[in-house]
Amino acid sequence: MRFFAWKENFAKADALIVENRPLPMFLCRVLASRGIKDSASAETFLNCTQPLCDPMELHDMEKAVTIVRRAIDEGKKILVFGDYDCDGITATVLLYEYLEGEGADVCYYIPERLNEGYGLSMKTMEMVISSGIELIITVDNGISAVEEIKRAKEAGIEVVVTDHHALPQQLPPADALVNSAFEENSSPCRYLCGAAMAFKLIAALEQQMQGEDPQDLLLEQYGDLVAIATLADVVPLKGENRILTRLGLEVLAQTERPGLLALAQNAKADLAACNSDTISFMLAPRINVTGRIGSVDTAVQLLLTQNEEQAVALAAEIEKLNAERRRMEENISAEAGELLHRKPALLYNRILTLVGDDWHLGVIGIAAARMLERYRKPCIIISCSNGIARGSARSVEGFSIIDAIAACSERLQKFGGHPMAAGFTLAEEDIPAFTAALEEYAAEHYPIMPVHTVKLDAPIAPEEITVANVEEMSRLSPFGCENPMPTFLLPGVTVQAVNSIGNGNHLRMSVTAGRYTVPMVYFGMPVKQFPFSIGDHIDVACALSINDFNDQRTVSVRVINVHPTGWRQGENLRAAAAFEAVVRGEETADATEVFTRNDLAGVYRYLRDNSPIKTGTDGIYYILRKKLDGYTYFKHLAALQIMRELELMEDMQPEGFVIKNGEKKVELEHSQTFRRLQKG
């Protein structure tokens, strides 16, 4: 079970009810939870009435337009230098396609992730110089390439940087620096992604020629790419990002790009009814995979081609890569699980750090995100090869992983990222010192670590779950970073029925509240792992959508997480923090509970008799606390850890436990955790 946390105060919803255009109260609660304080702001947000910004007002845009237009007119050799993620790929395609259409002498280059790494390098720059390039335009990179751009300038090459990443202390000596990070935090353009910045450059070039704002017309041609990049790069969907994504989704629904049509067909995505999820979970991962484990040029050619047969062939190649990526991810997760079985104390570090040999660098970030979901804490996956270690980190809200890494960076060869995700490189021999420094940093700055939570927008009553209300909720779209699909809490309902669906991988259940019955689906939760029984009282975190089937529209309720009603969340959080401190050998005043042999015996007997246990730590706690007197969350965590250390129990993947027969007698004193608890 994940812990629940409310967003902003949804009780302020009354201020958002517009006299002439009343909104459903539950929608007002969602708006209030997202910091929208008055009716005027609500109308602007819901209707996307804010006009697009003048591209010429962006930092150095006039300089950039002058340089690029002159290069086009004079037939100079132009290089579009991109990045290997979805944002960088689409930005490259967008700008290259435009410049080629303008008759420019243009080519593109995107470095390969594994062999070259991110951004401009000296080796690449020498290649660019020798090829006779006269103008470099970077997209989705360049702002930190100080030495590389200095070398380009020495060789007489003009450089225009378009980027959106954080500004370094020393800026590169480019001829123009067009970066959304230069804009004020209040600017609608502050959080534009790389492809959106490339779009702004195109718009400025067109505006210079036409004398009027061309952005609406340009979006008809490039809006699909801008929307894909914005959602794929997980930039905040506020300001202009919200407008560009909403308009871009409309363009994507009617796109004629053969590559996107072929990609969508393989993903079984209906572009005519596309939404944010279509991009985030179907299209973007497939574009990204070429930069992770394949050749990024496959995706570029897919998006550029006008040949349907070529598009189908390229999309098929990408589909194979995506299947291979899944296999790699599963292998890393399995090896990580084996590592945790051998070293279970790793689970109780403030930052879960797992180290392996030759794990694919294009996949370790995805694996880190999966481990974070399961263990509810920041996670770092490090892959070692030939003495070099490369890590990918994912974090939880409230703990900036990039700040932590930066504070411990003296042993790092390079690093970068943002509060929720980061990457780094170091010598393999420096891993122990680096991870120890991270733990010290976390202990000093976060006595109690933030945990991965389900962010709730507002409570909802069963009678509010109607087609009309959910249709109104669509006005909040597009959904994404800082504007996710609303998560509602349906509190105090009773489990009426639970059935297995999807070959046992998911479940469908019905809950009741008074005279109302609400059917819902819990994806990824097999019935065997579901700890609740008919008649149990539960609180359900859920998302709502419309299901169209046989010309009938009904509300679909998707379960995100479930708590037993009355779940002592705060108490359990404190117990978890106290127990983790015990395992780490730290002194803590909170670890005052007495743990006895009898506590362990009762837990072991139940788990042995019901092994394998196909539910998680919290699920089995819910079951055991009803069977064992005085069974607390602290004792539960202690019992599981002691059984791990004594090799009486093994964690299953993706969740659950298997108990070993235990034919030979074990001594509890052989468990370090048991000994520490006796001292306490």
Protein language model features and the residues they cover:
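Catalytic domains of riboflavin
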Residues: 1-2, 477
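Hydrophobic helix-and-loop "lid/oligomerization" segment in the mid-to-C-terminal part
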Residues: 2, 9-12, 16-134, 155, ...
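Acidic, two-metal ion nucleic-acid-processing modules in DNA metabolism proteins
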Residues: 95, 100, 242-285, 289-339, ...
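Residues at the C-termini of beta-strands that transition into short coil/loop
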Residues: 112, 179-181, 383, 563
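Active-site cavity-forming subdomains of large catalytic enzyme subunits
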Residues: 126-195, 199-212, 221, 238
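Short, glycine/acidic-rich beta->alpha junctions
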Residues: 140-144, 359, 363, 542
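Histidine-centered active-site/metal-ligand motif
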Residues: 164-165, 360, 418, 506
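Short alpha-helical basic/polar micro-motif
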Residues: 196, 365, 369, 540
